[in-house]
Amino acid sequence: MTSQEYEPIQWSDESQTNNDSVNDAYADVNTTHESRRRTTLQPNSTSQSMIGTLRKYARFIGPGLMVSVSYMDPGNYSTAVAAGSAHRYKLLFSVLVSNFMAAFWQYLCARLGAVTGLDLAQNCKKHLPFGLNITLYILAEMAIIATDLAEVVGTAISLNILFHIPLALGVILTVVDVLIVLLAYKPNGSMKGIRIFEAFVSLLVVLTVVCFTVELFYAKLGPAKEIFSGFLPSKAVFEGDGLYLSLAILGATVMPHSLYLGSGVVQPRLREYDIKNGHYLPDANDMDNNHDNYRPSYEAISETLHFTITELLISLFTVALFVNCAILIVSGATLYGSTQNAEEADLFSIYNLLCSTLSKGAGTVFVLALLFSGQSAGIVCTLSGQMVSEGFLNWTVSPALRRSATRAVAITPCLILVLVAGRSGLSGALNASQVVLSLLLPFVSAPLLYFTSSKKIMRVQLNRTKELSRTTDKKPVADRTEDDETIELEEMGIGSSSQERSLVSPAPEYKDMSNGMIVTVLAIIVWLIISGLNFYMLLGFTTGKEVHL
């Protein structure tokens, strides 16, 4: 008997009936003490559940931050600065709408990568005809090169301003730096290595955010009402050069390469879950850890997809949206109404204007933000280029050589422009890259819409056995057909006929995870809007419309 319990009194038979209530009272006392003891020892279930959810969410932090880097590269600087200097805060609405569209496309990318286990490029190779696949590969490489131009330009300019490094040498330094980091990134390696790499990129993102937070304190922003009213639609968005600048913001925000990146960074955590829970058995003979035959289980998708999408959306609507809005707000506060020709200013001139209108520190912080964002964007752009070349084509050369070649092809035009035209060449390359990306976006995004709406592609087998998770065919999933899977079943001894196979294992059951009707219609509308607006902007350029980007 514990110190908190009371022994019931033993009554005589003749008095038992009259005193049952006394024993009941003692029993109530014991029950009360036991309840208090359990309440003291056990933590609150609600708080414990919240802590567990936060810990689980923390394991998924990383991919969303890497994707958000794609939406705050030097191309965004150029368009946001032009918009802020010309219309002050009125085009914040365009930044907000562009961010919503980008988030919607990334939602589709995450679903495609999780359900199929393949990125967008690999799905193109597996499901599209050869000719169309090659055409899309060429367009994707053009998008990678155009994006890389902007990243290299931003980094080279920031190195030139901060450390007086010649532009040509700055371009070369960006190549060396990105290659070193890229060679250290192994998407099929251990999760520890992947998380270290993601932490490095996240650090650059955080530094960029810190720089613009400081920049906002430097700037004289004016009434808060004026800033927040910029997030509402106004005539400035749809009239004159405001419409063109809004389209430029859209083209600089919804980047083609981010679609390949967003669909290719979700697999490691799915694979980690399947390995831990016995749904996937890696081939011990695969020394390169390629995991080419991996297909996520339904359990892994159900467990991780929600956290993946949540982390992605939080990153886009906090980090990416904040940085893009901060660029426009700072430029609007300092350059709008300036006697200097801010609309025609390049990044060099923007630095000089910030130094003269605010302070030397404000200009330096702006260039530091440009350096951090240029470096991080260059890294993720090169990763996207790797996914494109490996997904569309089955290169047999070593990964290091393949990545080096991809990066070299991307920076060659930029290096030539620097050597031939110098500073003006860099500015021209930055502006031209945004036009090219606007033209390529509809073609690159169309397959994403098709794949995520296909019931045949977006399905997951529910009754997959763990033994079948390890495939005997060395052919990658992107190259495998239904005939290959049938042959594999026969080689594993699971019947050479449909009757024999039905006796060994039940018929496969699939879960449809394709887009619903509402999402499909919304995706088509968004695609048509982006395509139409981009075409309108390009039409303006061809007819001689002056738009300073």
From Swiss-Prot:
Keywords: Cell membrane, Manganese, Membrane, Metal-binding, Transmembrane, Transmembrane helix, Transport, Vacuole. GO terms for cellular component: late endosome; mitochondrion; plasma membrane; trans-Golgi network; vacuolar lumen. Residues 1-23 are annotated as: Disordered. Coiled coil: none annotated. This is Manganese transporter SMF2. HAMAP family: NRAMP. It comes from Saccharomyces cerevisiae (strain ATCC 204508 / S288c) (Baker's yeast). Belongs to the NRAMP family. The gene is SMF2. GO terms for biological process: cobalt ion transport; intracellular cobalt ion homeostasis; intracellular manganese ion homeostasis; iron ion transmembrane transport; manganese ion transport. Its main location: other. It is found in: Vacuole lumen; Vesicle; Cell membrane. It is a multi-pass membrane protein.
